[in-house]
Amino acid sequence: MGQVLPLVTRQGDRIAIVSGLRTPFARQATAFHGIPAVDLGKMVVGELLARSEIPAEVIEQLVFGQVVQMPEAPNIAREIVLGTGMNVHTDAYSVSRACATSFQAVANVAESLMAGTIRAGIAGGADSSSVLPIGVSKKLARVLVDVNKARTMSQRLKLFSRLRLRDLMPVPPAVAEYSTGLRMGDTAEQMAKTYGITREQQDALAHRSHQRAAQSWSEGKLKEEVMTAFIPPYKQLLAEDNNICGNSSLADYAKLRPAFDRKHGTVTAANSTPLTDGAAAVILMTESRTKELGLVPLGYLRSYAFTAIDVWQDMLLGPAWSTPLALERAGLTMADLTLIDMHEAFAAQTLANIQLLGSERFACNVLGRAHATGEVDDSKFNVLGGSIAYGHPFAATGARIITQTLHELRRRGGGFGLVTACAAGGLGAAMVLEAE
């Protein structure tokens, strides 16, 4: 085993995760239609502080993320500070690591805690797939800039005359990778074919995710970590995630047509995570600061790792790459884990990563390691369901998974939990959590 990297301050304090909260997650263009990510972020951070009863001035830093950027609020973190009654002097900045954004936010706050520059901070993320930055064509954008600099009406009219009707059409946000032009679903199809993952296996995982998420809600396991969202103009509320299909059957999944490779594909809307709106956040402190304030943490951040691979083929293998590093830095093995929670971007991606974590060939030939990371025990894996069921507001998913895993670890009497995700650009993230 490689070098263990303890996540402690210079005084030996562990990094405590005090509490976490999220909004319910809503499918695109449903309950949160028209509510921008910055407002979802304010909603969850305001409620998190109110529930924790921690004075706002205790929080010295807020690191927040947003993947679908809105030009009018480029620093979502600072807008949340200013919009929630937090101390105006609270440091705040924004991060983006695609689907691992709130993992990055947590890591950044943890690094500030270890450096000794703060003793308490908030990390999280929010995204809206319903409020999108609809742009204009490159030609229209260029003409508008030139028109702004034109001095006479004739110059302006001449510039506008260059435009055609197609140049006036709105341009939605890109759904493909900038570098390759591939959509995430195209990559999921690649992975299904590369690793021999069948449609039946994908549908079974998706069905499992929905069944377990529905059961988690019915048993009341998520009530403490999901707020009730009152939706402007405050005539409606949302108390639970609205994507979960607890009454579906495997036969229902089989009816859907492939969404990306129409002829030969196996990836469908049902075995993929949907576009979703929502926000999530966690409070982190040094262990000594929690004792000063009389707080009992949910748990502790034991280690983390971020990785990057090539984007042209099977790029959603982040968990298979980042997990062995995070375990190594924590001084643990897969056998030591009580729970494993992997972001389910697609069932195909999830199953491919599970396969490679247990592969000796992948470990030796690709990672340069002597042994496989370890088989994933189904009884420990995504026990409360995953992103296919809950939904995936890109920047919020990491904070959801962290909070959910720590609560479940505490229900089980403590232990270690692995949380991990793939992300666009061939990125990967993994963290090891500890609860007592």
From Swiss-Prot:
A single GO BP: fatty acid beta-oxidation
Disulfide bonds: none
CDD domains: thiolase
Pathway the protein takes part in: Lipid metabolism; fatty acid beta-oxidation
PROSITE patterns with a match to the protein in the record: THIOLASE_1, THIOLASE_2, THIOLASE_3
Keyword annotations: Acyltransferase, Cytoplasm, Fatty acid metabolism, Lipid degradation, Lipid metabolism, Transferase
One Pfam family it belongs to: Thiolase_C
Catalytic reaction equation(s): an acyl-CoA + acetyl-CoA = a 3-oxoacyl-CoA + CoA
Leading EC class: transferase
UniProt protein name: 3-ketoacyl-CoA thiolase
Gene: fadI
